[in-house]
Curated annotation (Swiss-Prot):
The gene is TIMM21. The chain crosses the membrane at residues 108-128. InterPro entries: Tim21 (IPR013261). Residues 68-98 are annotated as: Disordered. Belongs to the TIM21 family. This is Mitochondrial import inner membrane translocase subunit Tim21. Residues 1-18 form a transit peptide. Its main location: mitochondrion. One of its GO terms (biological process) is mitochondrial cytochrome c oxidase assembly. GO terms for cellular component: TIM23 mitochondrial import inner membrane translocase complex. It is found in: Mitochondrion membrane.
Length: 172
């Protein structure tokens, strides 16, 4: 995050130098402990060498590598970027905290969306199976009514084939 901020300051200074404008804004200087502001009539980035002792986070030692920019005298000619690369002992690059927070927020959002989708699908399945297999469902009610009609004697005679009905009437 600090590197991004410093990169933005460098681009701003390039813009101010190319337009030959001198602003009376405070100039940013990177110190060992923190960022400080220093009033200056000229906009130029002062490069300082920064040495960082390896930090141990969760049992993994991190190493910070800084590239040294040109001296202040050569800053007018070419201002290069200051880059910070964090590497753990496992060989992979460590992810910044802001990136971890962003990924955790994205993962949480995806979890909420998936849980919402599962609950909607579960509700639909519950409603469908309740309609199909409940004792008060329309299919069960019509099924019971059909069984009563089939078991009734008048219903049985009406469902016989026509030839059986005629044979019964005509036979002595």
């Amino acid at each position: 995050m600090i590197c991004t901020f410093l990169r933005a300051v460098q681009y701003t200074e390039k813009l101010h130098r190319s337009l030959a404008k001198r602003l009376l804004l405070p100039h940013i200087v990177l110190n060992k402990a923190c960022l400080k502001t220093e009033p200056s009539l000229r906009c130029r980035l002062q490069y300082q060498k920064k040495t960082v002792l390896p930090r141990c986070i969760l049992g993994v030692t991190q190493k910070t590598i800084w590239t040294q920019g040109p001296s202040p005298g050569k800053a007018k000619e070419d201002s290069s970027k200051q880059v910070s690369v964090h590497r753990s002992q496992r060989g992979g690059t460590a992810v910044p905290t802001s990136q971890k927070v962003k990924e955790a927020g994205r993962d949480f959002t995806y979890l909420i969306v998936v849980l919402f989708g599962i609950s909607i699908t579960g509700g639909l399945f519950y409603t469908i199976f309740k309609e199909l297999f409940s004792s008060s469902s329309p299919s069960k009610i019509y099924g019971r009514a059909l069984e009563k009609c089939r078991s009734h004697p008048e219903g049985r005679s009406s469902h016989r084939p026509r030839s059986d009905v005629i044979a019964r009437i005509c036979s002595p």
